[in-house]
A protein has these predicted regions:
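Conserved acidic/glycine
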Residues: 1-65, 259, 266-268, 273-357
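Residue-level signal for pocket-adjacent positions within structured domains
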Residues: 2-3, 17, 42, 50-51, ...
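A short, flexible beta-alpha/helix-coil linker loop
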Residues: 13-14, 86, 192-195
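Cofactor-binding active-site loop characterized by glycine-rich and histidine/acidic residues
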Residues: 39-42, 46-183, 199-205, 210, ...
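Short secondary-structure boundary/hinge segments and terminal tails
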Residues: 65, 90, 196, 231, ...
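A general secondary-structure junction signal
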Residues: 83, 253-255, 336
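Glycine-rich ThDP/TPP pyrophosphate-binding loop and its adjacent helix/strand module
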Residues: 126-323
Length: 357
């Protein structure tokens, strides 16, 4: 990979100049977060095919960029996701059951079924909900950072987006505002090579996405997005600079969307299997596992136990979430106004008075 920050070498050793020097507990926690995201994705795609959830957007291949970036942020920082970052919410403490309730839109869904599946929110973890249109979260993240700066808070905001979002007007507006007002924003672009069926080569004429930051007056850095330690290092440094008042940073994590865009997509219709195989050889999970093994922290026994543990956790969460009924029908009208106005109450009363099947 050309001109991209890399920490983990092919043999599992690390570049001593860039290694964040994790303890065993830190390294294992990062690997667990990545493994949880991978196993969850595979299980949720299977549930969708069985008709037990309506929609799912997997993150296969992007676990290092998601978990590595999220773990680099302080607990008081904010995370503004797109639709592929449940791993970021989970490493912040979101219970699996709560995530499953959102996917199923049941009575314990934090947003009462008002959102699409995969549009998670975790308030305790400062993890914002999202809107489906690509790129709309970028101005929101910059606004949160601007508010932090006005309040004199030493915090930072991490916002995730993909290569396709760099073609939107909201990307320009957010980057320009962040650069002019030096907001404490870390822009994490998951360049996974494909925006549904559009390759990154058709998104931009620039050599890299990271260099776009130059036009807005701040730094951009390109990292190997299949290397969790590289993403962690770049995000940690960017967040530190943001808290110190040095302004935003654009981090381009060069990664690959190994699976479909969503459960409604068939990537075999538009991309070459040889390309997929090339990127699968760089899979971030075996790579991080090799790092753990090189450090003497991992073996096949621990791997088997971890997979079993995560699988059991997901099974329990699914079973618990499926026992919960759907939301009460009147919640359709909830959370629109702080106090329901007369016209909406009238509509609700009329709706609830309709005969039910």
């Amino acid at each position: 990979m050309v001109d991209a920050l890399r920490v983990i070498r092919d043999d599992g050793s690390t570049d001593p100049r860039l290694d964040p020097k994790f303890s065993e507990d830190q390294a294992v926690a990062m690997y667990r977060g990545m493994s949880l995201q991978r196993i969850l994705d595979n299980r949720m795609l299977a549930l969708q095919r069985q008709g037990r959830i309506g929609f799912y957007g997997p993150s296969l291949g992007q676990e290092a960029a998601i978990v590595g970036a999220a773990m680099a942020m302080a607990p008081e920082d904010w995370i503004v996701p797109q639709y592929r970052e449940p791993g970021a919410a989970l490493v912040r403490g979101m219970p699996l059951k709560e995530l499953l309730c959102q996917l199923m839109g049941n009575a314990e869904d934090p947003v009462k079924g008002h959102q699409m599946p995969c549009h998670y929110v975790y308030r305790k973890g400062n993890y914002l909900s999202i809107s489906s249109p690509v790129g709309t979260q970028l101005p929101h993240a910059v606004g949160i950072g601007w508010a932090m700066k006005l309040r004199g808070e030493k915090k930072a905001v991490l916002v995730f987006f993909g290569d396709g979002a760099t073609s939107t007007g909201d990307f320009h507006a957010a980057m320009n505002f962040a650069g002019v007002f030096k907001t404490p924003t870390v822009f994490l672009c998951n360049n996974n090579q494909w925006a549904i069926s559009v390759p990154v080569s058709k998104q931009t004429a620039s050599g890299t996405l990271a260099e776009k930051a130059n036009a807005y007056g701040f730094d951009g850095i390109r990292v190997d997005g299949m290397d969790a330690l590289a993403v962690y290092r770049a995000t940690r440094d960017a967040a530190r600079n943001a808290r110190e008042g040095l302004g935003p940073t654009l981090v381009e994590a060069v990664t690959y969307r190994m699976g479909p865009h969503s459960s409604s997509d068939d990537p075999s219709r538009y991309r070459d299997e040889a390309e997929v195989a090339m990127w699968q050889a760089r899979d971030p999970l075996p790579r991080f596992r090799k790092y753990l093994e090189h450090a003497g922290w991992w073996d096949e026994g621990r791997e088997a136990r971890l997979e079993q543990e995560i699988g059991d956790e997901i099974t329990r969460a699914v079973q618990e979430a499926e026992r919960i009924p759907p939301p009460a029908i009147e919640t359709i009208f909830a959370d629109v106004y702080a106090e329901m106005p007369p016209h909406l109450r009238q509509e609700m009363d009329a709706f609830l008075g309709l005969p039910r099947r």
